[in-house]
């Protein structure tokens, strides 16, 4: 076993305490029999103390190296416990919904419609209709910081709202584009249909736009003609068409874009087309979307390549801190109902708006809070704090974890000049006019790539890595751990008993000493002698 069943008196060192004695003896027994490499040489009786010390230093250094490597394995496991694997490059594309498509006019308002509405309003003293129309560009102050606006213009627009008892959302509702004023003709899955059946008005960072297959919860408007009966009804969500994807141009989405605005002037508006935004169904259309410009007088083909990321059941079982990502229902936000990463960034932007200016812009209003909607008087604050609002500074940034499951879209454009008189049998091209734009959005393949977020290593692999580190440097295994526990519990207790019993026996067998009597003289000189009595 490597330890003695009984001790001889000469093996007991009375100069040390019993605790040190039995601990030293247990350590010697352990070094003599342990499977850990190098320890037996630290107690080898055939070598001197210098060799013992050298081997002890070597063993300590090797043990430290093993601990450092084991800690490295563990920290890697904790910091990046997952990895991405390609599940398949040939997943049928019909497993996905057709990508949400949002079309935004490149000018905020329909000027013909705006002029007609402003004619029905009371104008501030000294203001003219044309002047008010030119001042509508002040709305860009809610979005950008490109321009500073004069206090006179701001107060004049505020006076216009006050005189007509209007709020910013009510005012915008009568100026914005309707989808039938942007989209002339639509076709989906090879069938020509009314655009209003698949496109709906949506809110975006660029104002009001028209979206297909987008989930946007929180509002929908009631389209009424007169100001007195204007209302905004806050319902559950924008209707989600749930149209499935099919690969190929024939089964894609095609639209003819035409501005229904006689006052539209591309030179004056500095715009000659529309914006195309493609993003996840639950994402708020913004600069985080795959954004492309679709020019008029051209036919544009937008080939979309989707890529899906999903999680294995093992990753789903991890806590958020270990998988370093969240699912939609795990990270609630104040201003958006569904968590996707772009929504979190925008939620941070709205939070900063409220923090610095006490309000948020009208296109972020989804009836989820009672926060005030910004008016024209808030534009200087929004412009001055633009860097803070869009989180350019680290102090204003928010924590936004990655989403565990998401779909990314890569969009590639190809365009050609639009031929108006080209003879084709397709009725979709009939009636095209100058300044029209034709857009085709389609999945460019019948299959797509699917990525699986999986565990980089499970607990079994982690234990194996930890064991390999200790095995490499000190030759330890799980059996060595059992040995350590055994020796410093069972053997330590036995050595303790042996130490105590042996010391007790030595005390009972200790020689008896006595001083001689005072009148007992053995010599003329006074000497101290011991008289030993045999027992």
From Swiss-Prot:
The record, for InterPro entries, names:
ENaC (IPR001873), ENaC_CS (IPR020903)
Localization, UniProt: Membrane
Q: Which domain of life is it from?
A: Eukaryota
Q: Which UniProt keywords apply?
A: Glycoprotein, Ion channel, Ion transport, Membrane, Sodium, Sodium channel, Sodium transport, Transmembrane, Transmembrane helix, Transport
User: Which Pfam families has this protein been placed in?
Assistant: ASC
Spell out the PROSITE patterns in the cross-references: ASC
Q: Which residues lie on this side of the membrane: Cytoplasmic?
A: 1-49, 493-535
Q: A biological process (GO) annotation for this entry? A: sodium ion transmembrane transport
Asked if the Swiss-Prot or TrEMBL record annotates the protein with the keyword Nucleotide-binding, the reply is no
Question: Which residues does the annotation flag as glycosylated?
Answer: 165, 239, 367
Q: Choose one Gene Ontology CC annotation of this protein and give it.
A: plasma membrane
Q: Membrane side Extracellular: which residues?
A: 71-471
The membrane-spanning stretches of this chain are 50-70, 472-492
The GO terms describing molecular function are: ligand-gated sodium channel activity; sodium channel activity; sodium ion transmembrane transporter activity
Question: Which tissues carry this protein?
Answer: Embryonic and larval tracheal system; dorsal trunk (but not at fusion with transverse connective), several branches and terminal cells. Also expressed in adult tracheal system; dorsal trunk, but not at the spiracles.
Which intervals of the chain form a coiled coil? none
Topology relative to the membrane, per the entry? Multi-pass membrane protein
Q: What does this protein do?
A: Part of a complex that plays a role in tracheal liquid clearance. Probable role in sodium transport.
- What family does the Swiss-Prot or TrEMBL record give for this protein? Belongs to the amiloride-sensitive sodium channel (TC 1.A.6) family.
Q: What is this protein called?
A: Sodium channel protein Nach
């Amino acid at each position: 076993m490597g330890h003695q069943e009984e001790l001889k008196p000469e093996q007991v060192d009375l100069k040390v305490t019993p605790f040190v004695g039995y601990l030293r003896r247990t350590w010697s027994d352990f070094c003599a029999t342990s499977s850990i490499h190098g320890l037996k040489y630290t107690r080898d009786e055939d070598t001197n103390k210098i060799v013992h010390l050298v081997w002890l230093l070597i063993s300590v250094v090797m043990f430290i190296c093993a601990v450092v490597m084991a800690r490295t394995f563990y920290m890697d496991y904790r910091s990046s416990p997952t990895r991405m694997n390609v599940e398949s490059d040939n997943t049928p594309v019909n497993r996905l919904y057709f990508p949400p498509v949002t079309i935004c006019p490149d000018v905020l308002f329909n000027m013909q419609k705006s002029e007609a509405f402003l004619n029905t309003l009371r104008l501030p003293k000294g203001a003219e209709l044309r002047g008010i129309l030119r001042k509508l560009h002040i709305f860009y102050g809610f979005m950008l910081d490109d321009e500073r606006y004069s206090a006179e213009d701001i107060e004049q627009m505020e006076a216009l709202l006050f005189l007509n008892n209007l709020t910013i959302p009510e005012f915008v509702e009568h100026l914005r584009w309707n989808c039938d004023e942007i989209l002339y003709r639509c076709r989906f899955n090879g069938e020509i249909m009314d655009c209003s059946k698949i496109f709906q008005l949506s809110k975006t960072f660029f104002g009001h736009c028209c979206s297909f297959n987008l989930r946007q919860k929180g509002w929908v408007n009631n389209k009424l003609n007169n100001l007195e009966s204007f209302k905004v009804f806050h319902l559950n969500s924008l209707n989600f068409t749930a149209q499935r994807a099919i690969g190929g141009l024939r089964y894609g989405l095609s639209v003819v874009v035409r501005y229904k605005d006689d006052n539209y002037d591309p030179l004056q508006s500095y715009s000659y087309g529309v914006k195309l935004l493609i993003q996840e169904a639950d994402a708020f259309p913004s600069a985080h979307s795959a954004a492309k410009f679709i020019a008029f007088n051209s036919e544009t083909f937008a080939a979309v390549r989707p890529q899906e990321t999903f999680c294995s059941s093992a990753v789903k079982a991890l806590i958020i801190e270990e998988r370093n990502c969240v699912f939609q229902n795990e990270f609630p936000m104040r201003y958006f109902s569904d968590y996707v990463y772009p929504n979190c960034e925008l939620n941070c932007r709205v939070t900063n708006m409220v923090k610095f200016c006490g309000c948020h812009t009208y296109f972020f209003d989804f009836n989820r809070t009672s926060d005030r909607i910004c008016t024209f008087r808030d534009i200087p604050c929004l412009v001055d704090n633009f860097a803070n609002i869009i989180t350019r500074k680290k102090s204003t940034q928010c924590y936004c974890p990655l989403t565990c499951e998401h779909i990314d879209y890569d969009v590639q454009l190809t365009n050609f000049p639009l031929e108006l008189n080209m003879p084709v049998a397709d009725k979709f091209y009939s009636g095209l006019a100058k300044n029209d734009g034709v857009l085709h959005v389609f999945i460019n393949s019948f299959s797509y790539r699917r990525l699986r977020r999986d565990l980089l290593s499970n607990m079994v692999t982690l234990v194996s890595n930890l064991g390999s580190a200790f095995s490499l440097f000190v030759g330890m295994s799980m059996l060595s751990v059992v040995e350590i526990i055994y020796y410093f519990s069972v053997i330590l207790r036995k050595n303790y008993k042996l130490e105590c019993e042996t010391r007790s026996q030595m005390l009972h067998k200790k020689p008896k000493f006595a001083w001689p009597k005072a009148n007992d003289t053995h010599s003329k000189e006074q000497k101290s002698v011991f008289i030993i009595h045999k027992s």
